[in-house]
Amino acid sequence: MADPIFNGDASDTKTAKLTRPVTGTSTAARNTQQSAAFENSASVSASTSTLQSTTSSTPRINHNPSINSLRNTHVGGAGTETGRGISAAQNAALTGASLAFSNAKEGRAKARVVPPVPNKGNVQLGEKGLNGNGGALAAAAKAGAVGHNAGGGGRTRSPSKVSAMDEGTVHGQHILGSEKTGESQTTDGGSINGRLEHQIGHTGLQKRKQRSNGHLLPPFSGSGNSMTEHGANMKSSSAAFMAANLAAKRSRESSPSQSHGTGIGIGGGLGKQGSPLMSRRQSYASSIDSLDRRLDVSSIPPTSNLVGMWEQANRGVKKGGAGGGGESSSDRGNEVVSRQESLRRPASSHAPVPVLKPEGLTRPVSSHVPDVELVKSSATKPAVQPPNTSSQASISDEIKSPGKPAVQPQIVYSHTSELEPKKSAAKASVPLRPSSSQDLISEETKSTSKPAVQQRPVSSYTPGSVTLKPSSKSPAQKPVIHNTRPVSSHGPSPNFSAKPSIQKLSRPVSSHSPPPTKPSAKPSSQSIRPISPRAMESTESLSKSPVQKPSIPPSRHTPADAPALNTQSAKPQVQAPRPLSMHSPILKPADRDEPSLKPPVQPPRHSSTKTPPKSPRPKPPFEPPVSKQSYNNNYDDDDGSSDDSFVSASSQPKPKSPSFRAKIAQQKRSQSTSISSMNVNSLANAIVAGSLASSRASTPSISSGTTRAPAPPPTRRHKNLHIFHSDNSRTPTPPHNNGSAAGVPIMKTTMRKPKTGKELKEEEGEGEKRRAKKHLVKKHPNKHNEGNRKRWRDGITERERKRYEAVWASNKGLFPYTINQDGEMVEVDGAVDTVPGIVVRDIWERSRLGEDVLEEVWGLVEGRGYRSRLVANMKAGGRLEKDEFVVGLWLIDQRLKGRKLPGRVGSSVWGSAGPMGGIKIRS
């Protein structure tokens, strides 16, 4: 929005400066100073014109805020007024439009719903319509006519939409027209009026919801107001109420700033204690309106301060002078509506919008910049605005008074941070470039002769530098403590501890922002980092102190627990700057081009490590000492990466040469390895020599006269092989001579018992006999002695007989009784030494031989063959005696071995199994 700045003279128009696009309902810059005579005459003629307008024409004209009525109003010609003053007719129209709010309440229930008529030719709002004096009178007449139509001639308490809209359009046209001359209007209409339509459309629904609670009181309604009625006119009345607030505030702003008398009093305290949006725009417009005024930038207070704001609104009305009780109540109503409008205000865009102030201050506008609180309390040069003015665009009396604490600061944009421009002879503008996610706040350059130092980008985590020149016109500042609530606390923020004087900062509200760190004056495009709630300072106090020259580049890894140097005492303290070697040091401006001459130094991985050893290489004389926590590369400060994240080691540039520490470690390692290798080799040689000497002492193979040089030490891989493997110089051990008398070596026995000499002789003799017999009888050795060879049928061995007898002994004597032919139980004779046949069958069946084989064995052993028939007649049930049972078991074993059963058991077998079978009789 390009608006010419007026100094109160119609002919003196300064060059148009690009100012900030303003969102919300209050749009244009304020009117300049005007005489009190116009204002008094306006208040007198307002009552008559408005009372006459209430009984005028009956047609109701509804201006729909969503249509181009407001835009048509502001897009009109260059305007008929040039900022010198407002005519009595327009002041009467403004006052009449404000008084017309009380004409529409009583007859609202009776009023017929009239649909809104869009502005399509009914009312011309251009240069021939509501522009100039005739437009203002027409707006007042329409407001009176609508009030008369709704109320039936009675005095109502509800505001009317038409009166409010006409008043708002007249005021918008009047204010824009009063500050525009010539061709400087071309860029005006779209930006402001579009937001007016947008804001009016958005705030209508919210005010309609609030009217039922009774919180929203119409102005000039007295003590009997009741907002409980709901009807079809609620929408129109809410929009009218909003426009009326705008008109009332502008009528108060249009009062002359030099007049010490009483003003109109409509919304007397609204400009200062009203909604945050109107207060912000008021302070912003006042800073543009007067070159000597300084922009009061403060943050939005929390909602808990609403009560204090309302009380200050009442006090501001009383100090306004001519308001009175009715005006105080109207201000409260206007304040509530304005605050609700500001809550529905669309957020500012994320794209930075350059703002060119007259003083050359350029500041990026973003939605994530914390508020910077700049309070003006001048001791040598007073504020341009007198204390009796009704607009109160600067700081309120409560804040300026030294006795009272500043409870309510001037409210500025919640999503932007502004620095107050100071008047300078040379209006040099220093464009600064906003950073990625943390918008920066540029300091003001107030030097008339030398410009600001060109700044270069800083590394990712190095805070932005503060480049301040001592001001030539900076007045004595009295720091004021404010209760500031930051809207955004993103990212680290610099603590301006490099300045000799530090102002008392606001109390920390948000605990999510990282601790502030010291600023780095390494040249950067970021003049000042966004200030966190723990590190906010007044730019005025900073501008007084000269710039302290930095010393060395800062460390990339600044410790997070670096103590913040902001003072939390009750009074502002002047604190000496910290020594730069303790924390992030700063590079001097003279050394900005010198890091290229310095040898690159590899940064340590952790800043908390010890100071690296001194480098033996000569360093330039201008290089300052490096502190403990700032040992870093000099060229690391030139990379501009993200502002709020630590840079990992992988993203840093690779060092061109290894650091001195690495070289020292490598040299030490190489020396230690060489020395240790020599020590190990000599030690190994000594050990091997000792072991060889001890081993050769017992070996007589080497002659004592000859001395040989020690063998070379074995390789490292085979250093232990000499222990297990024989060397060529060693002689083998002689064999042991432990054998027979003949000297023939004898094989060692394993598990066998050593044989006696008799057995050895028998074996030798048998061998000789076998060899001789072989030679004698070469073929068929058993051909002529058939009966002399051993056979298996000859007899039972001793071992087998003992085993079989054991089985007999365990089974004899069973079943000693039997039944005779008469059926009597008869004891069997000899049953004690015999085994019954049933038991024999059971035992023999365990051999799993066939029944025919078992029958054959039974037949061979029972009664010894020939006695079986006789015994069978004598013995009942058949029993086997000891020798019969033993021979039967022996036959079964032979059959199991694969031998055939004989047709007859020989006498030798019976003799070996009898009672005398085991006894050998020698002759």
From Swiss-Prot:
Q: Where is the composition biased (Gly residues)?
A: 262-272
Q: Which GO terms describe its biological process?
A: lipid metabolic process
Q: Where does the EH domain start and stop, copy by copy?
A: 800-906
Q: Residue spans with biased composition (Pro residues)?
A: 613-624
InterPro entries given in the database record: EF-hand-dom_pair, EH_dom
Q: Which UniProt keywords apply?
A: Lipid metabolism
Q: Which residue stretches does the UniProt record annotate as biased composition, category Basic residues? A: 770-782
Question: Where is this chain compositionally biased, Polar residues type?
Answer: 22-40, 59-72, 280-289, 386-395, 448-475, 485-504, 538-548, 667-678
Q: Give the SUPFAM superfamilies listed for this entry.
A: EF-hand (SSF47473)
Q: Where is this region: Disordered?
A: 1-83, 203-232, 247-290, 316-678, 692-789
Q: Where is the composition biased (Low complexity)?
A: 41-58, 519-534, 643-659, 692-709
Q: Does the keyword Lipid metabolism apply?
A: yes
What's the family?
Answer: Belongs to the IRS4 family.
Physiological role: Positive regulator of phosphatidylinositol 4,5-bisphosphate turnover and negatively regulates signaling through the cell integrity pathway. Involved in rDNA silencing.
Protein name in UniProt: Increased rDNA silencing protein 4
